[in-house]
Amino acid sequence: MMILHYLKSAVRSLMKYKIQTVASMVGLALGFVCFALSAVWVRYEQTFDSFHRGADRMYLLGSSSAWENQTNLKHRFPLAEELKETFPEVEDAAAYWYWEIPVKLSEDAAEDVNLGCVRSDSLFVRMFDVRLVRGSWSFLNVPEEVALTEEGARRLFGTTDVLGRTIYYAGNTYRISAVLTGWGQHTNFPFSIMFGMDQTEKNKSSYPDYYISLRLRSEADTAALMAQMNNSSLKYKVAKMWNGKKSVLSLEPLTHCRYTVFQDRLSVSIFYIRLFSALGLLLIVLALVNFFSMLVSRMHLRRRELALRIACGSSRVGLTGVFLSELLLILSGAVLSGMIFIEIVEKPFCTLSGIEGSIRLPVAVCFLLLAAVTFLMTWGIIVFYCHRIASRQLQPAVVVRPERFSFQKICLGVQFGICALVLFALSFLLLQVRHLAHTDIGFERDGRATIFCPDSESLKEHIIHELRRQPYVQEVKQLYSLFPQGSSGGLAVSSWDGKLDNADPITLNAIPEGQEFIDFYGLRLIAGNSLKAQGDTMAAVINETAARMMNMANPIGKKVGMWTIVGVVRDFHVSAPTVPVDPVILIEFNCPVQMGRDILVHFDESDTDRLKHFVDSLVQSEEPGVFLKITTVREAYEEYLRSERTLQKLLTVVAVVCVLITLIGVFAHVSLVCEQRRKEITIRKVNGATAAGIFHSFLKEYFALLLVACVIAFPLGSVAMQNWVERYVERMAWPWWLYAAILVGLALFVVLCIGRSVWRAARENPAEVIKSE
């Protein structure tokens, strides 16, 4: 019965302060939602491939690459068995080929389905515990047979009863002889189809094309094992890279590969996902500060009621029970509201994050943990203030004296500070992304497109001929694609004019093109002359980065290997904006570096869809089923900004939630303060104060809090964003005006929050207020 009494009292109290109750519930719910979603996302990204047996002891073998900051993951097939036989620390080893391949139901099928494919042997099956659902393992030894996972069978045929059926791939028909268990998509190698390998293919050691996974014994020392591998003379290890440097083997934990060696597969950088999680935690802090502020304000507003309860015999436990009942109701409402929000955002969130299945269970667990932590923290505050009120109940003068509570002011200042910090970060991000999207990247990106198509010269000639007849096409060339790069080649250079004796060889990104290529992309010559269309094959043009790497102040006329430098072009970006510009050399056609050429189109950017539709229709009418891809320079560059665009969306959501929580909190707080200070406002009016003067006094108080909060938040935000922007090669000028803009915006926000409540309180009839008091 006592519990029922507490609940009734709690409901009456919460109904009396409706605005504050709703503000507390909504604020906590929004904070819970943002933090829970970010926590689920981080956990999902950090648990890729964790379902394998002994996943904490599994590694992916890597080796150093000729290109800086890159790791080579492909090796010769026999190296896996050699490592297992040579090093007792290796418990299991498996080599496998993995790629996504287009599969058809028959040769005449109009459409193909892209499936993750693995080619390997029984060692892969044993190491990764691949289970046979139906059929036999004969496909591992019979080249004409293949196995599908249950998920792959459903995608192709709509059923798992597929034994004996056939599929078509790469000009061959394969019979399905097995159905296997799959791994789903929560893995770095989501395969749906598996081929076996005959002994002849396994013994081929000429070209490294296979991933190698190792499972080490529990007592193995990873660092010591890597040292032994690199000091041993392994027969199937690539001893030296093509630039002459020694190849160094490394072991990357399989569960870390998602955000290390395979980070380019991420739609959002793991750094940004963790940042989103940190922002979710910041929102929880904001919501809790908002909640605690209103809780303490309500307790002080009810101090007479509480003192009367104590005078009538109520104990501290009883007072605590009243407030804990209110707390339980508010937390229950927040959790229920949060689950409703989750229902609304679950689908778009899963699409953005790539999480499979429902997230309701982990989110619900996260909600309960957050609610429990909030309950325990609030319990402490309630006990403290109940003890304080009980200790003063025999001092009426103290109880009834109006007070200005510093706790609420601190809470408001924290809310303003967090809001200013998030708004500054979002605004800075938007400006930097806009700068990256519109900055000069060293070549023309407007109206340039690349058509990647098969090596059919007749088809290419036909496409070029038809494109030149289109009114929106200015120019069509068959050249190397600069951006996006279709293929790339490295040129190891160990000698050049002015080279120091202790200087290491350098690797240049070699482009076998001349003047036609330079003109098409609008590369800017800053020194010397350009390459002639049919000039000296020993002439070369380099970029600024190559000149700096070779320490050439005036490179014109100097030798690089067998080539003579005739010109220098301005640096141009053909990689992500976080990656420094590569050293580049442009050389004539008859050179050792051989690269494929694609169809380059200069056209009106507004007709992008029209161009794509025309080329697709043309190719399908000439050679149906031929794979063709059209990409504009702008689309390819936007792909590099994909993580930043996603972070922009996440930060926008966080900023909106942050402003909303602060708006609700400030409005609710001002409503309580106006209720608490009604008599003070009335006495001021009786003594001659005007409504405008009272409103001005409130504004001064809140503007002072806002100014102090911004003075603290802006330096913190500046340091954080300075560290973030240093990741980029191209950076915008520091926006000093942004501080004033955010401060003015938040000041208007404060006026909006407090205006109605303060103005209404200031215009009340003093006689009515005195009567009610």
For the regions a language model picked out, list residue spans one by one.
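Membrane-helix entry/capping segments
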Residues: 1-7, 12-16, 20, 52, ...
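Alpha-helical transmembrane segments of integral membrane proteins
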Residues: 1-25, 262-265, 295-306, 310-328, ...
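Transmembrane alpha-helical interface segments in multi-pass membrane proteins
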Residues: 305-350, 679-726, 741, 745
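A generic "structured core" feature
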Residues: 13-15, 308, 319-320, 662-665, ...
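Membrane-proximal extracellular/periplasmic loop immediately following the first transmembrane helix
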Residues: 38-102, 201-202, 208-215, 219, ...
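Mid-to-C-terminal secondary-structure elements
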Residues: 121-134, 146-268, 465, 469-639
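Hydrophobic alpha-helical transmembrane segments of multi-pass inner-membrane transport and secretion
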Residues: 16-43, 268-304, 332, 407-432, ...
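Hydrophobic alpha-helical transmembrane segments of polytopic membrane proteins
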Residues: 363-384, 420, 663, 710-712, ...
